[in-house]
């Protein structure tokens, strides 16, 4: 199973004794509505969790098929549906106003999913933090920057939307198991800047590269979450030390 969040959620579900079946794009075409319907109806799952890149039409088709078959459908969105140059934190009912292609794409997915099924679960996620490089998470970003520059330069002014992958996976499981359909925002950052997060990760993982602060005006671009509990960064990160 590929991606950043999917393997973590699959692991969390298996801890609950839930069988997990991956979608093999080499066998089930995502651009063929009949194939999409056939696969879902043959599997007869309780839940379909869509965390992959793909067209909004694919997402909407899955949502529609799930609604017609009484299957819970989850789509993981992103905080990037909001314009990060504007002040936050952003409430769940704020109209998406992304200016970049990725944010607009995810917002379009949301719109088409809701049109296809008002019973869908949509969970917007922030920048995820894993345990090691190797996927699209913050630590991997740090290692790639360190290879390019010999150091990691991060903002000491911007407060990003973040959560640990393990906490996101747990929240997604609880969302499907215990909450009603709707739009949710999973936020795990109590208010740490990216530099503060990086120094705390440095203290935890003992990176072999320096962390350098980049000073800029303070800006809070987190999401507001008052619906579902998400593990906070400060629960897992020690106080930062000078890297």
Labelled PLM ranges:
Residues 30-68:
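NAD(P)H-binding glycine-rich loop region in Rossmannoid oxidoreductase-like domains
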Residues 207-243:
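C-terminal amphipathic/interface module of NAD(P)-dependent oxidoreductases
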Residues 23, 51, 73-79, 123-125:
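SDR active-site strand-loop-helix element
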Residues 19-31, 214:
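A short beta-strand-loop structural module common to alpha/beta enzyme folds
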Residues 114-160, 167:
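NAD(P)-dependent short-chain dehydrogenase/reductase
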Residues 1-16:
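N-terminal Rossmann NAD(P)H-binding glycine-rich loop of SDR-like oxidoreductase domains
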